[in-house]
Structure formats: structure tokens, C-alpha cells
Design a protein with these regions (language model features):
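Hydrophobic membrane-insertion alpha-helices, especially the h-region
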Residues: 17-30
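A short, well-structured edge-of-sheet supersecondary motif
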Residues: 78-110, 327-329
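N-terminal Lys/Arg-rich, disordered targeting/topogenic segments
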Residues: 1-13
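Active-site-proximal loop and beta-strand segments within enzyme catalytic domains
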Residues: 107-206
Length: 329
């Protein structure tokens, strides 16, 4: 279980959301994300300027097509000049300025990145798991003060660890060993129950095991798999359409191949990630999606369409010991 992070900042008066998903490196989708809310590249690609007036970011269709706004050619050019490889979505004042792919998703097949290329989102998935937990809180299944012992009493210190502690990474939980040859959710939960210890409770310590346990709690509460819960909320309710779990990524025509970064962006070192490595990331980092779907999720979340903004604010102000709250800094 690797450490992969997202960051939360507040300020400004308009939406400004920038998502840049790099070609997957070492099994981690690296995401650079900045959002404010109070309300080749080696592929020769001509910018397709969308002249239509409807570039609103609250229209999901606009997140699936290539867009370079008439006044955003310089932004597009700057991205190309960096030899950036991946997909970029830039939104300002609820208008899509740039939504475009750069470089190759698969160099051997000469398959270019597009707005519909899917990338591993890494630890951003922790925010999705958090929202599922908050949804359960709204449904009265638990609270931020519910103790870990309610679900996993055998874990060291469980009687003093709250859901809030786990979401804020202040539980003190960590693995005493790393799993090998584990490929199912049940196996990783069993391993975690047997190999989790507690150190320095109350202090921030980034440990993905918190979210493995939270995913396990969700399955216990609903008697449904984590993937079923994920699909029900984010596909059926939120309307995400271009995402999936690691088991099906390679089957998708719009998936991205992993490459090791090189100075010349030569695409000459393909990285093969064992399925077991992703299986270990249960609830913490084994989902792939497009930049558009990631934006759509965050837009729905911060607009109060998934859980109440009051509950979000309660979580985000629940700890003075940590700047990390439920998958976002």
C-alpha cells in the first residue's frame, strides 16, 4: 500500500479546477489538483477549437470532448511546450478552457491520449471511500465518533479509535508487515486484521491501512461489495460513466499504458504492474477514470449533491492535529 496524496485548498470566489493526470508511473496515478470553491508533446495534434458557446462544466458532455476555448490557445501551447504526457482539464468560472490529451497513451499502438483516456487515480480514491462513509453517516449507520472496535475489535487500540481518527490519519494505525500474493478483498482484510499495530495515536501519520479498514466497514454495514457500493453511488447517482477498477483496466480500449519517466519522454520502458499490487490497494488506490469523471465527482461532492456540505465541513474541521481530511489535504 503506497502513499499517494491529494491536496485541498480554500480561497477565491470562483471555481478554478485543474486536473493533470500523468501517464501511470510505477502503478501510481499521479494527480496534481487545485480547486477553490465558494459557490506535445510527441504527437502532432492540431487544437480543435470549439466555437460553440456551450462550454459549461456542469454539462457532462463537455467533459468528454476535446476543447480548446478561443482565448485559451496560449494555455494549450504552454502545456505542449513542457512535453507533458497525459490529459489536462482546465476549468474557470464554470467554463471549460482546455480539455485535451497530450502524448501517447500507448506508444506501440500509436494511441494518443484524449479527454477519454483512463488513468489510475491512486490515492484520490480515498476521497471516494470517504464519501461512501459520509453517506453511511447520513443514513444513520454510524457517526464520526463511532469506534473501530464496533467493526474490528481485535485490532490494537480499536476501542479508542474513531472513524474521524481514521479519516484524518491520526489513528496511529500502521501495518507491521506487507502483504504478498493477496488478490481478493477478503484476503487483504484478513491480512490487515492480523498485521495492524498502533503507534503515536493522535499524531498525523499517513497510513493507507485506515482506508482498507473503512472499505471493509462499508461491506459489513451494507452487506454488499465495495465495488457495488462504489458503482451505485458514483455511476447510478452521480452519473460518472468512464471509470473502473484495476481488474478491467487492460480490457478497456481507452486505457493508458504505464511508462517509466525519462528525460526525453522516449516511451522505451513499459512498466507492468502485478494485479496483486493493485489488490492490496482495496479502498485506497485501485480505481481508474478520466479527468472528466474525476472533475465531475468533485463538482458533485462540493456542490452538496452526494452528501451535505455541512457534513463535509464538519469532517474538514474535525482535527487540529492533521491537515489531511478524508482523502484531501
Amino acid at each position: 500500500m503506497r502513499k499517494r496524496h491529494a491536496k485541498k485548498r480554500h480561497g477565491g470566489v470562483n471555481w478554478l479546477f485543474i486536473v493533470c493526470l500523468l501517464v501511470v508511473i510505477g502503478g501510481s496515478g499521479y494527480l496534481i489538483k487545485t480547486f477553490f470553491f465558494t459557490r506535445d508533446s510527441q504527437v502532432s495534434q492540431e487544437s480543435k477549437v470549439v466555437l460553440e458557446e456551450d462550454r459549461r462544466s456542469d454539462n457532462y458532455a463537455n467533459l468528454t470532448k476535446e476543447i480548446v476555448a478561443p482565448d485559451s490557445g496560449e494555455l494549450d501551447q504552454k502545456i505542449q511546450e513542457t512535453n507533458y504526457i497525459g490529459s489536462a482539464l482546465i476549468i474557470k468560472d464554470d467554463q471549460v478552457l482546455v480539455n485535451k490529451g497530450y502524448g501517447f497513451a500507448n506508444f506501440e499502438k500509436q494511441q494518443a491520449n484524449t479527454p477519454n483516456t483512463r488513468f489510475q487515480i491512486g490515492s484520490i480514491q480515498k476521497s471516494f471511500t470517504t464519501t461512501l462513509i459520509l453517506k453511511a453517516i447520513e443514513e444513520g449507520k454510524l457517526t464520526l465518533d463511532t469506534k473501530l472496535a464496533t467493526f474490528y475489535p481485535q485490532i490494537q487500540g480499536a476501542e479508542d479509535i474513531t472513524i474521524s481518527d481514521m479519516l484524518n490519519m491520526t489513528s496511529g494505525l500502521k501495518l507491521s508487515a506487507m502483504p504478498n500474493n493477496i488478490v481478493t478483498d477478503e484476503e487483504i482484510i484478513q491480512f490487515v486484521k492480523q498485521n495492524t499495530i498502533q503507534v503515536n495515536k493522535g499524531k498525523y501519520n499517513y497510513s493507507p491501512v485506515n482506508f482498507v479498514l473503512l472499505a471493509g466497514m462499508l461491506e459489513k454495514m451494507y452487506q454488499r461489495t465495495y465495488q457495488e457500493l462504489f458503482n451505485n453511488l458514483y455511476h447510478k447517482t452521480a452519473g460518472l460513466k468512464n471509470f473502473g477498477f484495476y481488474e478491467t483496466l487492460l480490457e478497456q480500449p481507452n486505457n493508458s499504458t504505464s511508462y517509466k519517466w525519462t528525460e526525453d519522454n522516449s516511451y522505451n520502458q513499459v512498466l507492468s504492474i502485478p494485479a496483486a499490487s493493485f489488490a492490496h490497494e482495496f479502498g485506497t488506490g485501485n480505481v481508474d477514470m478520466t479527468t472528466g469523471d474525476l472533475y465531475w465527482y468533485l463538482h458533485q461532492l462540493t456542490s452538496g449533491h452526494l452528501v451535505s456540505t455541512a457534513l463535509l465541513q464538519k469532517l474538514w474541521t474535525s482535527s487540529q492535529q492533521s491537515s489531511y481530511h478524508g482523502g484531501i489535504y
